[in-house]
């Protein structure tokens, strides 16, 4: 292979790697956001329950 062909193959490999990296990164961001939403809903559920709120003041923002 000539120099020009090797450079072209190199650029194609870099481009393919970059596309795969950004695509998988976005997918993991979505999973992180979904997990964060679930945690938030769980904490809000505890904070709306008086018994849970008293037992977990650090979660609900109230310090003893």
From Swiss-Prot:
Keywords: Acetylcholine receptor inhibiting toxin, Amidation, Disulfide bond, G-protein coupled receptor impairing toxin, Neurotoxin, Postsynaptic neurotoxin, Secreted, Signal, Toxin
Main location: secreted
GO cellular component annotations of the record: extracellular region; host cell postsynaptic membrane
Alphabetized Pfam families for the sequence: Toxin_8
Location of this chain's protein in the cell: Secreted
Residue segments, region Ser-Xaa-Pro motif, crucial for potent interaction with nAChR: 48-50
Disulfide partners: 46-52, 47-60
Sample GO molecular function, one term: acetylcholine receptor inhibitor activity
Comment, domains: The cysteine framework is I (CC-C-C). Alpha4/7 pattern.
Protein name per its UniProtKB record: Alpha-conotoxin Vc1.2
């Amino acid at each position: 292979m000539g120099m020009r062909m090797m450079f072209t193959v190199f650029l194609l490999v870099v481009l393919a790697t970059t596309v795969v990296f950004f695509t998988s990164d976005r997918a993991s961001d979505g999973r992180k956001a979904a997990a964060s939403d679930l945690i938030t809903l769980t904490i809000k559920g505890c904070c709306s329950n008086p018994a849970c709120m008293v037992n977990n003041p650090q979660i609900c923002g109230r310090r003893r």
